Amino acid sequence: HALMHGPTFMGNALACRVALASISLFEEEHTMEKIHRIEEITRLEMAGFTDPRIREIRIMGACVCIEVYDPAVLKGYAAFARQRGVFSRPFLSYLYAMVPYVISEAELVQVLDTMKAWFRQR
């Protein structure tokens, strides 16, 4: 079955053009700078936040993940977050957010505060 996926990975002209346009948008809209700023704010907001139920907090770019020891700790989080204007849900033992690159600082803080409030109120 050699080259079975050849058409998928060959230089499809439309796909190449779309990829180049996407790269141009990243450069023109300073997207990488926005992602770095999101990460910086997230690190500042999450600094020092601990809870004995949390195994680890990971942050990379526009993603934050709180891993807990027991997934039952996260039961009910989606409804809790919705009441605070945040659409989010846990997955297994992970409470995470992958925010859009156009998020405002106030909106980002709202997402992070909601995550922290879940642990503080329980």
Question: Where are these predicted regions, by residue range?
Answer:
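Conserved N-terminal phosphate-binding loop of PLP-dependent enzymes in the Aspartate aminotransferase
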Residues: 1-122
